[in-house]
Amino acid sequence: MKRMIALDGAQGEGGGQILRSALSLSMITGQPFTITGIRAGRAKPGLLRQHLTAVKAATEICRATVEGAELGSQRLVFRPGTVRGGDYRFAIGSAGSCTLVLQTVLPALWFADGPSRVEVSGGTDNPSAPPADFIRRVLEPLLAKIGIHQQTTLLRHGFYPVGGGVVATEVSPVASFNTLQLGERGNIVQMRGEVLLAGVPRHVAEREIATLAGSFPLHEQYIHNLPRDQGPGNTVSLEVESENITERFFVVGEKHVSAEVVAAQLVKEVKRYLASPAAVGEYLADQLVLPMALAGAGQFTVAHPSCHLLTNIAVVERFLPVRFTLAETNGVTRVMITKLTD
């Protein structure tokens, strides 16, 4: 019988990522875990609908037994079974992030007995979670280099706080893992500005694009008008394609916040990324930790290791025989993964 891993949900940044990573790793390794103090660092601690959906999805996919799976719960015991591929559908029932639920269960399906399709309904454009276009255009090309083949499709947008969006991912079992080396970003090839509108006047998008164009040489710019019933909502994104990596940054518009202020937030974030030669942005770094750990080797550079990143690394090291080493040189942190030997 495998040992029970005890996790403190209050460690590090004390958010939901500790739970999501633990669920993924438990399904993959077969190791059960207990987590207490779930989301202790948040204003509203405990399981929200999004986190509960992730728990229920993980439970269904690996036929786990679970204790504490209810709204507001701050303690969970998860004992995984065998991961099985198939066609799965999960509904969050709020504007909670579809991509964060997918992020929880897809790694386990890389080890399933056959191909799978997972469809999640909820929020697609959420200020605190990566949108589907980030997964599709930034993360999945890097996963393919590691040997992980999955394809995400956004079927319907759902903006915070209403939700109603749908995202689906098709995934195949991994035959073998490759190592990923992301040392330098390289020269910028082109930059693309993109705005989504649903039930919002077009001039909002035009002003957002103008603000981006005032700071960066946009090679391409797009305005997408979505059906009104998918809103109201507005997201502005900027994609930076460099020689060795493509990064994408976004800001979700808010009521009573001007188009110029929304776009200026994005400009600030992109400038922070470009100020360093590091290849990987803050949010992508979080997404790379688990797949690169499963490969057992690799490295990437990031300007500043976030508390979120360090917390995620700590959880991964509890489940997998790997060690992460962080080395800072000239304002760039190199994150290196090595496999531990018995």
From Swiss-Prot:
Catalytically driven reaction(s): a 3'-end 3'-phospho-ribonucleotide-RNA + ATP = a 3'-end 2',3'-cyclophospho-ribonucleotide-RNA + AMP + diphosphate
Residues where ATP binds: 103, 283-287
Record InterPro entries: RNA3'-term_phos_cycl_insert, RNA3'_phos_cyclase_dom, RNA3'_phos_cyclase_dom_sf, RNA3'_term_phos_cyc, RNA3'_term_phos_cyc_type_1, RNA3'_term_phos_cycl-like_CS, RNA3'P_cycl/enolpyr_Trfase_a/b, RPTC_insert
Sorted UniProt keywords: ATP-binding, Cytoplasm, Ligase, Nucleotide-binding
Known EC number: 6.5.1.4
Gene Ontology CC terms: cytoplasm
Family: Belongs to the RNA 3'-terminal cyclase family. Type 1 subfamily.
Full protein name: RNA 3'-terminal phosphate cyclase
